[in-house]
Amino acid sequence: MEQDNYQWWQKRFRKMAEYFTAYRIDHILGFFRIWEIPSHSVHGLLGQFVPALPMSVDEIQSYGLPFQKDFMTKPFINEEMLNKMFGDKAAFVKETFVQHVHDDIYEMRPEYDTQRKVEAYFSDKKDEESIHIREGVYALISNVLFVPDRKHPS
């Protein structure tokens, strides 16, 4: 490899640059699959390996976990969580970013249901309090048990 100045590696990285804006190889799996982060995410928690072998609903249920798609693939947000995460700013977060569903359960408002939408809202707000709220809202959005496979949604 050294004799040809690592041409194989250089070609591989050039080809990968056609598909990804950033990549990191820190494990042998990096040679075979890529951790893909959706464009609507700021953090990588909602990403997935590509290619991947997703779990089916039947497989999840075979482990004794009754699968409830909305409950397990959408952010779980309740009153206690909002108060604990945001303290005296919980009312602002409720008014701005989430909407009441039932009892003490909330969901993200459609206009702020992705981290990129939240990022845009905070683009001109750089104070410590705004950063704390922004990061908390990012965490709310990432608070899911399962991420649907984009190539095999079922």
Regions picked out by a protein language model, each given a short descriptive name:
Residues 1-154:
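Catalytic cores of glycan-processing enzymes that make or break glycosidic bonds
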